[in-house]
Amino acid sequence: MGQKVHPNGIRLGIVKPWNSTWFANTQDFADNLDGDFKVRKFLNKELANASVSRIIIERPAKSIRVTIHTARPGIVIGKKGEDVEKLRNAVSQIAGVPAQINIAEVKKPELDAKLVADSIASQLERRVMFRRAMKRAVQNAMRLGAKGIKVEVSGRLGGAEIARSEWYREGRVPLHTLRADIDYNTAEAHTTYGVIGVKVWIFKGEILGGMAAVIESEQQPAAQPKKQARKGRK
């Protein structure tokens, strides 16, 4: 029976960057890793309703820098930045070093696998029909420019006695092509019948040039649309 490798894990260092970027010697490595795990667990719990996509952790010179990618930055920042200051103090206490928190906005949440999976899971918890939730997510992603998307849900679908899996795909999702930019993530829907698992694969196109191209695209600011000069009457 064929098994699927984790799409993010197999592409690390090829077209996918790491979520934690720091270097540590043997003595500090375990502490840093444990600190990262605790910080992520805390932030995911605190920001459960803030549409958090990714949490990037860097550790420059005995400090910690956390970048939160979210579709709703206003909720994370709070009124006059109060909430983000509370998060900074809490992260600093967990990690044991001074903390800095940056917020990055996700411009198109419909093309982010984590946010799509969370959206489907929340709909299933609200008793929306699973086929409708899947189809809506697929249509929104394709409308906004995805090259392909696949959604799979598994569990006691519709309250059935026997658990099963169902999936829906549109476009192409090349899992074997290493240069393919495939965003993959999962979520869980806790329903009255039990847990339903949600998996989402989104194919955004091929990346030519490897990690160098990925880093360059992340560093470049989003291009501002040019305002056309209005022609006056002569």
UniProtKB/Swiss-Prot annotation:
Could you tell me which PROSITE patterns the record lists for this protein? KH_TYPE_2, RIBOSOMAL_S3
- MF-aspect GO terms: mRNA binding; rRNA binding; structural constituent of ribosome
Originating gene: rpsC
Task: Fetch the HAMAP family from UniProt.
Answer: Ribosomal_uS3_B
Q: Which organism is it from?
A: Haemophilus ducreyi (strain 35000HP / ATCC 700724)
SMART domains (alphabetical): KH
User: Where does the record place the KH type-2 domain?
Assistant: 39-107
| NCBIfam families, A to Z | rpsC_bact
Record's keyword terms, sorted: Ribonucleoprotein, Ribosomal protein, RNA-binding, rRNA-binding
- Family matches, as Pfam families: KH_2, Ribosomal_S3_C
What is this protein's function?
Binds the lower part of the 30S subunit head. Binds mRNA in the 70S ribosome, positioning it for translation.
Could you state one GO cellular component term attached to this entry? cytosolic small ribosomal subunit
Question: How does this protein assemble?
Answer: Part of the 30S ribosomal subunit. Forms a tight complex with proteins S10 and S14.
Which terms under GO biological process does the entry name?
A: translation
Q: What is this protein called?
A: Small ribosomal subunit protein uS3
